Amino acid sequence: MARMGLAGAAGRWWGLALGLTAFFLPGTHTQVVQVNDSMYGFIGTDVVLHCSFANPLPSVKITQVTWQKASNGSKQNMAIYNPTMGVSVLPPYEKRVEFLRPSFIDGTIRLSGLELEDEGMYICEFATFPTGNRESQLNLTVMAKPTNWIEGTRAVLRARKGQDDKVLVATCTSANGKPPSAVSWETRLKGEAEYQEIRNPNGTVTVISRYRLVPSREAHRQSLACIVNYHLDRFRESLTLNVQYEPEVTIEGFDGNWYLQRTDVKLTCKADANPPATEYHWTTLNGSLPKGVEAQNRTLFFRGPITYSLAGTYICEATNPIGTRSGQVEVNITEFPYTPTPEHGRRAGQMPTAIIGGVAGSVLLVLIVVGGIIVALRRRRHTFKGDYSTKKHVYGNGYSKAGIPQHHPPMAQNLQYPDDSDDEKKAGPLGGSSYEEEEEEEGGGGGERKVGGPHPKYDEDAKRPYFTVDEAEARQDGYGDRTLGYQYDPEQLDLAENMVSQNDGSFISKKEWYV
């Protein structure tokens, strides 16, 4: 009804707009009959058909308002309003049609108790003088809400081994709808649906959907819902399937820890069946039950302490009206009880161990890397820079105090190297030396020695901190009876040849040198 009212309001505004357009546009002084283009209503409800007349010419006189229905190319009068004769409603509408506000400009009527036969084209006509009749048409659609329901099959659904044929399990019906409904199914079942439409003589449509599937134990107690969508309405109704099937048998009670002298143990036969199992039968794979074992319906009791004789395969057969099925369990007997460690306990114990192991491994890896770096730096610092040539060992510059043993001079911060060395450079002190040098005065003194600064004669030699063995021997012959820092001694030479100079100023034996 709210939607019909909204459509009617839209029609009135549309008609008013047309009337104003006809009135204000130059040259358009035609009379306009305003109606809704289309209307709809449901069977049994009321519908209002709007009609009004826009008369831009005051000189035009309205004499009558008439409602007609088009039927098979002809017009059938329904209701008439005449200012002189009043309102007249013709059969079969005399009890169903009324003018709401009868006047020269408003011919709106109400049609009550809609029937399917009311659907069609309606005409609103205004008789005017002297311009003649003016009319407009509207289309009325009558809708029928369907009746919906779902029903399960009356046949008994039975699941049988090897069955492949689908059977009807439910039917969903949406009857006497106009227009027809949309029917669907909502379920987890793996079936299929088929649809059928039946057009009734009165113009309505009945939609029927049938759902089929292969009966199975899994389909038992599953929900099957029928969904009907019609216009703005949604219908949903469901049912629960009842499928009969043979027993599905399992045996409970054996926990894998049956040991000698254990007591109070039993086996229970569980049968999933529809209808429920009514009979249980216990046996063993060898035939009869062992001594001390007693069957009571679906329970098997073990009397007394457990012995090795109770080991074996136990079978339970369950029977219902559909059939008989069996299940079995193998019982093993151990000498001593077994207490398994809970899974969560093992996991909890493993977690700290894994964490500690990871941390320890990381620390060890860091220590190894740091140690490797330190060792590499030490080796690089003490790497041997000399050579094993016996011709170029370091002995000093050949100058020292007479009678004072030669000492290795300290290293200077700034270093220079001999120009005549073609091998790797050997470091030596820069500048002059602090050694005492002697000089003979020319022309007097008879060999008198003076102690003072270095003689110019020795400046060049003093700048050379090192000499080779050959150079040292030559210089010894040249200086005669001068006192040299180097005294040729085969034992000392042998000792010197076995010594190696290091960058930090120390000497080590070749026999002890290593990298």
Swiss-Prot record:
Q: Which InterPro entries match?
A: CD80_C2-set, Ig-like_dom, Ig-like_dom_sf, Ig-like_fold, Ig_sub, Ig_sub2, Ig_V-set, Nectin-1_Ig2
**Which stretches does UniProt call biased (Basic and acidic residues)?**
447-464
Q: What is its main location?
A: membrane
The record ties this protein, via SUPFAM superfamilies, to: Immunoglobulin
Region of interest: Disordered: 399-486
- What residue stretches are annotated with the Ig-like V-type domain? 31-141
**Signal peptide boundaries:** 1-30
Pfam family for this entry, one: V-set
Keyword check for Protein transport, yes or no: no
Looking at the UniProt entry, the stretches that span the membrane are 355-375
Side Cytoplasmic, residues: 376-515
Superkingdom to which the source organism belongs: Eukaryota
Q: Which GO terms describe its cellular component?
A: adherens junction; apical junction complex; cell-cell contact zone; dendrite; growth cone membrane; hippocampal mossy fiber to CA3 synapse; membrane; plasma membrane
Q: Write out the annotated subcellular location.
A: Cell membrane; Cell junction, Adherens junction; Presynaptic cell membrane
Q: SMART domains recorded for this chain?
A: IG, IGc2, IGv
Q: Which PANTHER family match?
A: NECTIN-1, NECTIN-RELATED
Official protein name in the record: Nectin-1
Q: Which organism is it from?
A: Mus musculus (Mouse)
| High-level lineage | Eukaryota, Metazoa, Chordata, Craniata, Vertebrata
